[in-house]
């Protein structure tokens, strides 16, 4: 007698959230190509960092943590963790998926958190703006309504997700802000 396997009807219709693990990388890649000011504010701690020359792709890449032993040498991360103590007066950027919700079996959304932290001693810039607010503004302008490498349109509005918001973050001596974007997943 032959065993017959009856397929589960609709099994392939379920959302697999396959873009979840590549959202951080795709956001950083887009940022490398589309925003020069953020990279200058991350690399240079001077008050005139905004007026420095643009960084090369290699210089930007050197700021991104990719599993090295000492995390304190890097400025851009794809998670919210930092096991090494930060003793330098620097600016950090963290981009990571923070939450996912299945709205039904085929549609869901993913929240993407973007955190910027800057040491208080280097936060004020010579153009009468702050580093944290400038980077936050640039993140909103760069990512709101942007397709992130074919993975979904990031949005910062209450129509896509009630959790989209911007709020203060950090702990002395590092102040910061966190933005929550969302994207649909199908």
Which residue stretches match the model-derived regions?
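Residue-level recognition of well-ordered beta-strand positions that form the cores
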Residues: 96-98, 113-117, 180-184
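Generic "edge-of-domain/loop-turn" microfeature
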Residues: 100-102, 119-123, 186
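Acidic-leaning, charged glycine-interspersed low-complexity segments
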Residues: 132-186
């Amino acid at each position: 007698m032959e065993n017959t396997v009856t397929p589960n009807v609709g099994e392939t219709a379920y959302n697999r959230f396959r873009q979840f693990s590549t959202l951080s990388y795709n956001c950083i890649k887009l940022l490398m190509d589309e925003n020069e000011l953020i990279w200058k504010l991350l690399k240079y701690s001077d008050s005139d960092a905004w007026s420095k020359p643009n960084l090369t792709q290699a210089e930007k890449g050197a700021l991104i943590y990719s599993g090295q032993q000492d995390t304190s040498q890097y400025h851009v991360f794809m998670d919210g963790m930092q096991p090494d103590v930060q003793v330098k007066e620097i600016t950090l950027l963290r981009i990571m998926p923070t939450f996912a919700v299945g709205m039904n079996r085929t549609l869901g959304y993913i929240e993407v958190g973007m955190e910027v932290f800057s040491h208080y001693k280097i936060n004020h810039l010579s153009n009468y703006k702050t580093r944290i607010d400038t980077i936050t503004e640039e993140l909103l302008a760069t990512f709101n309504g942007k397709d992130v490498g074919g993975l979904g349109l990031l949005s910062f509005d209450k129509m896509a997700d009630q959790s989209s918001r911007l709020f203060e973050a950090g702990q002395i001596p590092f102040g910061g802000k966190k933005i929550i974007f969302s994207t649909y997943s199908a």
